[in-house]
């Protein structure tokens, strides 16, 4: 069994409980994590959970996708005591434990690569960013604690500085990996390159993940597992 004692496996949700619990159990089938947490409203968690899953109360209820994104940026670190967190969802979890490499732990953020797009994922300095999807991602406690040290703006749709952004979107992965990536990097955070991220997670077919069966997936299974 793969020992990931420095990683906490997490599902943050108060809906679709059966699917999220199943995703947690699927992810722990061949892996021993440092901790396994279902962060939710306790009155929404079914009884009789497997003993490996520890339930923690949300700091405040999540009622929308914006609430979720805000929680992931500013609050999730309060639940984590290991060096890293693997956040999963009911539509994305571990599918290939053998693809794990300790190289992943050298980074503060890894998520499935985004496709290169002419008009998307452009940071305030005009650079295209490709890593990466936050729904199923590996993050360091160091990265999660950055908002406790410096101001990480939530509203990234106002003014000239964020002129490259998609107005009206508050997605947490866009905030951390595109809009305010420079602020995290100033605190020493290191983002995985596309080639490493492609080995970590699959979301859609890309030249970089051709022929690979990554460690986790988000939404769509890699071709080798369909």
Predicted feature locations:
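Extracellular/periplasmic catalytic domains that process cell-envelope and extracellular macromolecules
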Residues: 2-4, 79-80, 103-104, 129-131, ...
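Conserved donor-nucleotide/metal-binding helix-loop-beta segment in metal-dependent transferases, i.e.
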Residues: 93-125
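Generic structural signal for small/hydrophobic residues in well-ordered secondary structure
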Residues: 36, 90-91, 140
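Short glycine-/acidic-enriched loop or helix-start segments at secondary-structure transitions
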Residues: 21, 48-49, 96-99, 148
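Catalytic core and acceptor-binding pocket of nucleotide-sugar-dependent glycosyltransferases
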Residues: 131-226
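Short beta-strand-to-loop acidic/aromatic patch adjacent to the donor-nucleotide binding site
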Residues: 82-94
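N-terminal anchoring/stem segment of glycosyltransferases
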Residues: 1-69, 73-84
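Short His-Asn-centered micro-motif
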Residues: 12, 39-41, 88-89, 112-113, ...
């Amino acid at each position: 069994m793969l020992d990931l004692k420095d990683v906490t496996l997490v599902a943050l949700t108060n809906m679709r409980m059966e699917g999220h619990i199943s995703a947690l159990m699927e992810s722990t089938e061949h892996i021993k994590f440092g901790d396994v947490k279902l962060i939710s409203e306790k009155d929404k968690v079914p009884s009789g959970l497997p003993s490996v899953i520890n339930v923690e109360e949300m700091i405040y209820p999540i009622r929308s996708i914006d609430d979720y994104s805000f929680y992931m940026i500013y609050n999730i670190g309060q639940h984590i005591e290991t060096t890293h967190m693997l956040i999963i969802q009911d539509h994305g979890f571990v599918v290939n434990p053998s693809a794990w490499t300790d190289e992943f732990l050298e980074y503060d953020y890894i998520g499935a690569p985004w496709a290169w797009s002419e008009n998307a994922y452009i940071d305030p300095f005009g650079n295209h960013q490709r890593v990466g999807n936050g729904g199923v991602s590996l993050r360091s406690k160091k990265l999660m604690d950055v908002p406790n040290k410096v101001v990480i703006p939530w509203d990234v749709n106002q003014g000239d500085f964020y002129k490259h952004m998609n107005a009206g979107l508050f997605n947490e992965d866009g905030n951390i990996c595109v809009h305010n990536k420079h602020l995290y990097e100033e605190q020493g955070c290191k983002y995985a390159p596309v080639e490493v991220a492609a080995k970590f997670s699959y979301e859609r077919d890309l030249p970089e993940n051709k022929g690979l069966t990554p460690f986790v997936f988000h939404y769509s299974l890699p071709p080798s597992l369909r």
